[in-house]
Amino acid sequence: MKEAQEINESSKNRIIGLSLETRPDHITKSEIKSMRNLGCTKVQIGIQHTDNAVLEYNKRGETIEDSYKAIKLMKDAGLKIAVHMMPNLPGSNPEMDVQALKEVFQNPMLKPDHLKIYPCVVTPYSEL
């Protein structure tokens, strides 16, 4: 990313915003500082679901509480937040998915600036 930043700094047409994607459990104050130093204005994180049982069933390796913590850190740093949600995950159902999507905008610990929805399709031979 450092090389891309250096190219942008001397480019005729400059990037005015940088959006980075990561996992909620990888967000730290140090990581946010590095992102801001690169000119990051928005971070996209893959929450996927708000139900910890669904996250565990799908081997996400993170909890919704990790997302709450990450979003607070990023908002405190002035970053715009995009969350990725994934309906149709194994272990969920349509009612749970609707509740998860409602929670994204009703829970004060979430409330992102941007939402991306990626419906899950489990492929043959997947561990899921």
What spans do the regions from the language model cover?
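Conserved non-cysteine loop/helix-boundary elements of the Radical SAM core domain that shape
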Residues: 1-82, 86-124, 128
